[in-house]
């Protein structure tokens, strides 16, 4: 048997703010989870997404420090249509989350935008552009 991809784990320095961000994007995160040091949800298709607070990470990796600089990964959320990309970007930035790249029509045929979650991780919003007539 070969290993099977199963979980994306992220460290967070503010569990409540992080979970609020991902709840706004539609993830079904249980109420009260923000008080836990480890939270995970199962996404459609079975992949799990998990967050550990800084103290939890340091419990098994005492030398861990939050990364700095630009994100090295991003999570991409498909929206229903290009207008939804704009709407979600506006809603999240108006709620105080960091917008990195405002929505644009990408040359690869998608409406695209990039935000950062509260820990600076890249979060992309995208939707296919209508085909040109």
Model-derived regions, located:
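Active-site/ligand-binding-proximal alpha/beta "capping" segment
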Residues: 101-104
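Short, small/polar residue-rich loop motifs at catalytic or cofactor-binding pockets
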Residues: 107-110
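Glyoxalase I/VOC metalloenzyme domain signal
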Residues: 1-6, 11-33, 43-98, 116-133
